[in-house]
């Protein structure tokens, strides 16, 4: 199986570092450094204002079904999950998350778990499920093998970030809801880090741990062998006695069986030994399952980054960073190029720069970056499709006018 991840839209560097890399590139003189920094600061301020408005809309649309809400409403509010989703999905796209399709999720559910745990998710309890991921990469992990006697290296596809949105059905079974402390029709929004692609099912709130065939065999085979030993040593005399009683009662022989005190003690001792053995095997099974649940819980504890409203606060910050980086890069490469460029040429130059300077395979979002520059009037497009950046002095003036128009 080819584990090579696709080129990513997400730019895995901070906007401050991207700005410094542009300044260190050597194509701007010292006077232009200050002007370029000022242009970048104004762009960041404009994007920050836009995303602040997005944040307010998200807070308003989420408040009616926010499970962590600690404020009171002045009047009854209707739940509008659709309005929230209409705000959330474009935000995830701006933050360069990719949607996990139903087919991708189905494939992930069929793959072997990295943690060697068999998990089951009941999707019939959900009215709506959304999964988004960002930063797919190939990682290597050391995992135990041969019953823990040795370890070996395995490669697996990993998501750096995963967002999951779940809305439970309004007609969720009351017993199920009470057992899992879930309110019918409620919503869960979570953000996780470092999630193996094959273990996406562990993120769902109703995930149950099941024993794999190998785990059942590890308990069952030794149990069968030791059980045979118990029966032959502890229950042999008891079985002979019970067989004689059964034969006498069924008329298979006429010799009566005497049940004296010694026979009764042997009978109950044998039954007690078998009962004790069965109880021990049941506890072995239960304890092994508890260890699996503990392993799952520990993994989720360290992978969970945020919940509910905290998730879209983080996403707002991520999306704002991505918008700033894309705009700064596109403007810088147009500004420092000796002639006008087409969108394709600009895209290829930026991606080549990341590959050669930063050893990073990037699928730069050229269309989105140019849309921002055009909206800010920082780039002009000729009839033949070539693009030219506005010089720094005019760009500063234009951005300043945009800022003044906000208030």
Model feature map: region roles:
Residues 292, 296-340:
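Short alpha-helical segments that sit at the start of domains
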Residues 338-357:
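Short acidic, hydrophobic short linear motifs in intrinsically disordered regions
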Residues 392-407:
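Short, amphipathic alpha-helical interaction segments positioned at domain boundaries
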Residues 1-224:
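Basic, amphipathic N-terminal segments
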Residues 359-371:
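Soluble catalytic regions of membrane-associated enzymes that act on cell-envelope
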Residues 214-299:
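Transmembrane alpha-helical hairpins and terminal membrane-anchor modules
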Residues 385-390:
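Minor-groove-contacting beta-hairpin "wing" of winged helix-turn-helix DNA-binding domains
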Residues 370-384:
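A short, conserved structural fragment
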């Amino acid at each position: 199986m080819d584990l090579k991840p696709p080129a990513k839209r997400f730019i895995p560097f901070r906007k401050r570092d991207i700005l410094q890399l542009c300044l260190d590139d050597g194509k701007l003189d010292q006077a232009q450094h200050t002007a370029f920094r000022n242009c970048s600061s104004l762009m960041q301020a404009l994007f920050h204002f836009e995303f602040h408005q997005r944040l307010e809309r998200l807070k308003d649309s989420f408040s009616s079904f926010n499970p962590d809400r600690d404020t009171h409403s002045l009047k009854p509010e209707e739940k509008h999950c659709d309005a929230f989703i209409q705000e959330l999905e474009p935000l995830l796209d701006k933050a360069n998350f990719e949607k996990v399709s139903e087919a991708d999720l189905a494939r992930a559910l069929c793959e072997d778990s990295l943690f060697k745990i068999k998990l089951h998710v009941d999707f019939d309890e959900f009215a709506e499920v959304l999964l988004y991921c960002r930063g797919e990469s190939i990682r290597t992990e050391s995992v135990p093998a041969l019953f823990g006697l040795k370890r070996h290296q395995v490669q697996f596809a990993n998501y750096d970030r995963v967002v999951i949105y779940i809305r439970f059905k309004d007609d969720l079974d009351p017993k199920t809801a009470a057992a899992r402390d879930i309110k019918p029709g409620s919503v869960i929004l979570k953000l996780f880090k470092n999630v193996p692609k094959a273990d996406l099912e562990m993120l769902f709130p109703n995930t149950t741990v099941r024993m794999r065939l190998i785990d059942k065999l590890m308990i069952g085979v030794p149990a069968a062998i030791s059980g045979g030993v118990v029966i032959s040593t502890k229950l042999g005399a008891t079985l002979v006695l019970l067989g004689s009683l059964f034969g006498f009662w069924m008329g298979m022989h006429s010799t009566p069986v005497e049940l004296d005190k010694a026979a009764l003690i042997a009978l109950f001792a044998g039954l007690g030994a078998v009962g004790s053995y069965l109880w021990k095997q049941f506890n072995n099974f239960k304890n092994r399952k508890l260890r699996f649940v503990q392993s799952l819980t520990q993994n989720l504890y360290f992978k969970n980054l945020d919940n509910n409203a905290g998730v879209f606060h983080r996403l707002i910050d991520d999306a704002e960073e991505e918008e700033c980086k894309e705009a700064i890069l596109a403007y810088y490469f147009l500004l420092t190029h000796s002639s006008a460029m087409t969108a394709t040429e600009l895209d290829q130059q930026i991606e080549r720069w990341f590959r050669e300077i930063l050893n990073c395979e990037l699928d730069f979002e050229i269309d989105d970056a140019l849309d921002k520059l055009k909206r800010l009037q920082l780039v002009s497009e000729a009839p033949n499709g070539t693009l030219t950046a506005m010089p720094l002095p005019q760009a500063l003036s234009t951005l300043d006018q945009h800022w003044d128009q906000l208030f």
